[in-house]
Curated annotation (Swiss-Prot):
Propeptide residue intervals: 23-41
Disulfide bonds, paired cysteine numbers: C70-C76
Tissue specificity note: Expressed by the skin glands.
Location (main, coarse): secreted
Physiological role: Has antimicrobial activity against Gram-negative bacterium E.coli ATCC 8739 (MIC=12.5 ug), against Gram positive bacteria S.aureus ATCC 6538 (MIC=6.3 ug) and B.subtilis ATCC 6633 (MIC=25 ug). Has no activity against methicillin-resistant S.aureus ATCC 43300 (MIC= ug) and fungus C.albicans ATCC 90028.
One GO BP annotation of this record: defense response to Gram-positive bacterium
Protein name: Brevinin-2ISb
InterPro entries with a match to the protein in the record: Antimicrobial_frog_2, Frog_antimicrobial_propeptide
Keyword terms of this UniProt record: Amphibian defense peptide, Antibiotic, Antimicrobial, Cleavage on pair of basic residues, Disulfide bond, Secreted, Signal
Length: 76
């Protein structure tokens, strides 16, 4: 019973230390990443532009397909 308590204490201690180290690293990352760099701004702009272009292409493709299906089935 004593050895089981001892091993549980060791596991708890090691878990607490690793959790503490992760918290310190997270705090350091938050302090460093306060301002967006120029590359991050460009990347976010390009991602937004790409998403808008994809949505426009899907919309155009759907309208072309609906027009073609209408003309092929002579229901226009």
């Amino acid at each position: 019973m004593f050895t089981m308590k001892k091993s549980l204490l060791v596991l708890f201690f090691l878990g607490t230390i690793s959790l503490s180290l992760c918290q310190e690293e997270r705090n350091a990352d938050e302090e460093d990443g306060g301002e967006a760099t120029e590359e991050e701004v460009k990347r976010s702009f390009l991602t937004t532009f790409k998403d808008l272009a994809i949505k426009a292409a899907k919309s155009a493709g759907q309208s072309v397909l609906s027009t073609l299906s209408c003309k092929l089935s002579n229901t226009c």
